[in-house]
UniProtKB/Swiss-Prot annotation:
Family: Belongs to the phycobiliprotein family.
Its membrane topology: Peripheral membrane protein
Primary location recorded for the protein, binned into one broad class: membrane
Gene Ontology CC terms, in alphabetical order: phycobilisome; plasma membrane-derived thylakoid membrane
Protein known as: Allophycocyanin alpha-B chain
């Protein structure tokens, strides 16, 4: 939920107008809108490149994942990992656009906990996968844009580590 929605719902629940501080938060949200849109555009336009680079880096760091018995061993399992990479990159993009980590939590982490536990996927490996996704993504952004985007990746990584 964006800051705008949060402010409106809270003010309405309390039967009042938004406070000066709340209006400043909305102003700040709008001021960063162009930057958030630019970041989202780069991430979405570069999805294939990001996923390819991140997966290559992950397989180099963790060859056991693609070795016999590994969770990404075989064409089908590897394709599922790449699909998940794209899904997580999309979640990061949602968070950046919203200026809020809530979409990552509600859409991504809550469902991931259940899914990966039921499939027996080791979550430390998923955290490492998201780290490589972060590295590949931030390399395509300006320094200022990378600074804005990084906390969304970090939130997802931390969520994977604490599941």
């Amino acid at each position: 939920m964006t800051i705008v929605s949060q402010v409106i719902l809270k003010a309405d629940d309390e039967l009042r107008y938004p406070s000066g501080g709340e209006l400043k938060n909305i102003t700040d949200f709008f001021k960063t809108g162009e930057q958030r849109l630019r970041i989202a555009q780069v991430l979405s336009d570069s999805e294939k490149k990001i996923v390819d680079q991140a997966s290559r880096k992950l397989w180099q760091r963790r060859p056991d994942f693609i070795a016999p018995g590994g969770n990404a061993y075989g064409q089908r399992q590897r394709a599922q990992c790449l699909r998940d990479y794209g899904w997580y990159l999309r979640l990061i993009t949602y968070g950046v656009l919203a200026g809020d980590k809530e979409p990552i939590e509600s859409i991504g982490l809550l469902g991931a906990r259940e899914m990966y536990n039921s499939l027996g996927v080791p979550l430390p490996g998923m955290a490492e996968a998201i780290r490589t996704l972060k590295e590949a993504s931030l390399a395509l952004l300006s320094s200022a844009d990378a600074t804005v985007a990084a906390p969304y990746f970090d939130f997802l990584i931390q969520g994977m580590e604490t599941i």
